[in-house]
Design a protein with these regions (language model features):
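Aromatic- and histidine-enriched alpha-helix N-cap/loop-to-helix transition segments
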Residues: 34-48, 105-113, 159-167
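Well-ordered alpha-helical scaffold segments within catalytic/enzyme domains
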Residues: 42-58, 70, 112-127, 167-180
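Conserved aromatic-histidine-acidic binding/catalytic patches
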Residues: 31-38, 59, 102-106, 122, ...
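Active-site-adjacent structural elements in enzyme catalytic domains
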Residues: 62-73, 102, 116-124, 129-142
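Low-complexity, Ser/Thr/Pro/Gly-enriched N-terminal "stalk/linker" regions
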Residues: 1-41, 52-101, 148-150, 178, ...
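A surface/extracellular/periplasmic glyco- and lipid-processing/surface-interacting theme
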Residues: 128-190
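Structured domain cores in non-transmembrane regions
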Residues: 96, 100-104, 112, 116
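Active-site groove signature of glycoside hydrolases
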Residues: 108-120, 150-158
Length: 190
């Protein structure tokens, strides 16, 4: 594919890098991967970039939508088959293009970034489905990536350590504004 050729030129990935991807999706390949690996943080960063770089002259909404669809296809436990059955969950944190999901859980920072990107996409492009998806993801994140006291877990399947870079105070305040859930004010001050 054309995308595979681009990755081969600039990242060392094979021409078949996107061969098994669900239709209408895009992904970010981890530059350090020995396999053609995508991590959920890369999708979240890509979504943020597409929405923040869009303006009247350059509109990246279609690229944003492809990244968001990839997230939905690889929602926790869906392994590329969830494109039409996503119910709000975070994305499996590692996806190998050849074998599917290989990360056993989600990464909190990716959920925070993707939810912020969806809120900003709603503000940028006015499509209310972005806001509805953001609310679903925020609620899922609260139930799976957060402690009841507002502290952040590293992801949905582990709670082994606190990573200060996962405390996304600005996002938490935005989540409170969007959901009207006081929990996020607690998270912002925890």
């Amino acid at each position: 594919t054309e995308a595979g050729q681009f990755y081969a030129m600039y990242g060392g990935a094979s021409e078949n890098a996107n061969q098994r991807m669900p239709s209408g999706t895009a992904r970010v390949i981890s530059p350090n991967a020995k396999v053609e690996l995508t991590v959920s943080e890369g999708i979240g960063y890509g979504m943020l970039l597409m929405v923040y770089m869009s303006d009247a002259q350059n509109d990246y909404q279609s690229e944003f939508d492809k990244l968001w669809k990839y997230w939905k296809c690889y929602g926790k436990g869906l392994n590329g088959n969830g494109c039409n059955s996503w119910s709000g969950q975070g994305m499996d944190w590692q996806v190998d293009n050849y074998t599917g999901s290989i990360g056993g859980g989600t990464a909190s920072d990716a959920e925070f970034d993707a939810a912020v990107a969806l809120i900003m996409a709603y503000k940028q492009w006015g499509n209310s489905s972005y806001l509805e998806d953001a609310k679903k993801l925020i609620n899922w994140t609260k139930s799976n990536d957060m402690q009841s006291d507002g502290s952040v877990r590293p992801g949905s399947n582990w709670n082994d350590a606190f990573n200060p870079s996962y405390s996304h105070v600005g996002a938490f305040k935005l989540f409170q504004e969007v959901t009207n859930d006081a929990f996020w004010n607690t998270a912002a001050t925890t």
